[in-house]
Amino acid sequence: MSVKKEIFGIHPSGKEVYKFEIVNKQGMKAVITNFGAILISLFVKDKKGNFQDVVLGYDSLEEYLDNHPMFGATVGRNVNRISNAKFELDGKTYLLDKNRGNHNIHSDKEHGFHKVIWDFEITGENSVCLSYLSCDMEQGFPGEVYIKMTYTLTETNGLILSYFATPNKRTILNVTNHTYFNLGENIFSTEFCIHAKSFTPVDEDIIPTGEIREVKNTPMDLTKYSYIGDRLNSNYHQLQIEKGYDHNYVLDHPHTGFRLIAQTRSMKSGIHMDVYSDMPGMQFYTSNSLKNTIGKNGVVYKKYDAFCMEPDYFPNAINTKGFEKPIFDSNKNFISTTMYQFY
């Protein structure tokens, strides 16, 4: 096991940006940059013994400076949607960037966690710890927040993402990673299983309605391994809104801590991925908005070429009655762990 550091590029501010390669004894390799705490590449062995890069991304720092799809991004302070780009906390109204119609998505797509240079520390032969101090009212959110995000590659082919954030006063924190996975060709050759009996339906703006609906007898039911290609053309309204999945699943056993929440496998490559988390929800997204984006090695990424599995608190939870609020303060840190296990 080893960690290699090298310069990835020069930021417009003049600062050097680095990338880190972590390789285990099986040859699995994770490539991370301290710009945006982004996962650039993840090389996993397929059924033929060859290593495939199973995540979408770019070749250069310059391309990540834009990164509209948010490939591999650490998203914060708040992932997903906030209706009308505002929320109330302790009697005060906070206004956010209206970056998706009248609403807010992923906090600030131009100045979020994925667009800043993080400090770094190589904390062992298999992990890199990235840290960032977010100032009071940055992105429109109250409170100063010091966050650490650690990538760890295990000898058993697991990639662990650990988050620890400390605010100095009450604020919203809902941090996740926005990696696009491609285990083999596209989502049509991949089977999915999500350990959730319910999901949160959305309106035409992809804002949860507040309902928690059972997946049973709907195309949203992924409680058993399923191919989803034929479902994308169904007349089920929730899938017609964006012509794909972009929904929060209400995970089973939400208060039992770190647990298996989802599984995927590609018969084409033979690669399996299990997802573990301690979060109550997970956003499942089938790259509905990808439009001929040129990525690594000149590959053109198209709609449905990849999927995201983003453990988190429910979208728009701060504004929705009955949803657990992602509110933290100096006496309550944001702590979360996600693991992507490959075999």
Predicted regions located by residue number:
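An exposed, glycine/acidic-rich loop-and-rim segment of catalytic or binding clefts
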Residues: M1-Y343
